[in-house]
């Protein structure tokens, strides 16, 4: 489910955001009005989506994080194809990994999911 189409571009954007978190955001007071913070929102989207489409969602999020917005809880969303039960069972037995994200369906169609970090 991880975005593997453009790993180089994702790695560059991820490194920039992690640098911002470590060197700039660490020395300022917490002022993000949302949960997850805008930088975590960006990292989660870059993990699951194409970097170019993720940048559009990230830009909208950053523009909405201003003093005139009430903020709140706003998890990122992504569109994914649901794997078949047989395929997911085979993958589960072969390479079990630690669960890091929950994908919670937003609608009954199960095409759009909220990304929630465990």
UniProtKB/Swiss-Prot annotation:
<protein>
    <recommendedName>
        <fullName>Putative membrane protein insertion efficiency factor</fullName>
    </recommendedName>
</protein>
<keyword id="KW-0997">Cell inner membrane</keyword>
<comment type="function">
    <text>Could be involved in insertion of integral membrane proteins into the membrane.</text>
</comment>
<comment type="similarity">
    <text>Belongs to the UPF0161 family.</text>
</comment>
<dbReference type="InterPro" id="IPR002696">
    <property type="entry name" value="Membr_insert_effic_factor_YidD"/>
</dbReference>
<dbReference type="GO" id="GO:0005886">
    <property type="term" value="C:plasma membrane"/>
</dbReference>
<keyword id="KW-1003">Cell membrane</keyword>
<dbReference type="Pfam" id="PF01809">
    <property type="entry name" value="YidD"/>
</dbReference>
<keyword id="KW-0472">Membrane</keyword>
């Amino acid at each position: 489910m991880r975005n593997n189409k453009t790993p180089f571009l994702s790695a560059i954007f991820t490194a920039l955001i992690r640098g911002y978190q470590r060197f700039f955001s660490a020395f300022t007071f917490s002022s993000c009005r949302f949960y997850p913070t805008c930088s975590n929102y960006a990292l989660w989207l870059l993990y699951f989506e194409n970097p170019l489409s993720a940048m559009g969602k990230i830009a909208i999020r950053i523009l909405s994080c201003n003093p005139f917005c009430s903020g709140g809880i706003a998890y990122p969303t992504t569109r994914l194809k649901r794997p078949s039960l047989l395929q997911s069972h085979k993958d589960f037995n072969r390479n079990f990994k630690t669960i890091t994200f929950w994908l919670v369906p937003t609608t009954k169609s199960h095409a759009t999911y909220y990304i929630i970090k465990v």
